[in-house]
Amino acid sequence: KYDAKDLESKLFVPERNKIIVDTYLKFVKDKRTVVFCASVNNAEQVADLFRANGIKAEAVSGAMKQSKRSKILKDYEEGNIKVLCACDLLNEGWDSPKTEVLFMARPTMSKVIYMQQLGRGTRLCEGKEYLLVFDFIDNANLFNAPLSCHRMFNIEEYVPGALVFGQGDRK
């Protein structure tokens, strides 16, 4: 778990938000994108910057009225909004198969949350061939590091054909 004030000082910097928007403009402009942000305030800041750059974007949160939130999500589904910026709200229980891009812009120590967020973009949809994920926090390296038997059992040297585990059970 992260301290909210510490996150504010580390993540809510204009330069970082600009990198997020610049990445969208350079690589995935006009693709439906979800930006997972560290807080509601952060989501609003990032959405503001997208709009300042001519991109139809909205922040969504549990703090807003249900009717407003539903309208924003409907507009996103219909393609009227290209970028959704959210904090936790869309992690689970929300499906949008048309989402083509995810921006991971919040840290998490939870593999479950990371996988839930990743799952928001993995839904199949006609015409969707792939999902692009941009990780601005490096969660991917934390949760997707390759795991081998050698690493699991602290075996430093790979020897072709050697037993990796169960060596003590041999008779």
Region annotations inferred by a language model:
Residues 34, 42-91:
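Conserved helicase ATPase core of P-loop NTP-dependent helicases/translocases
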Residues 82-108, 113-120, 130-136:
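A short beta-strand element within the Helicase C-terminal
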Residues 1, 73-75, 147-153:
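Short, surface-exposed amphipathic charged segments that create phosphate/polyanion-binding patches used
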Residues 26-33, 53-56, 97-100:
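Short, surface-exposed connector motifs at secondary-structure boundaries
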Residues 1-34:
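Conserved interdomain linker/interface between the two RecA-like ATPase lobes of SF2 helicase motors
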Residues 22-26, 49, 75, 120-121:
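A generic secondary-structure signal
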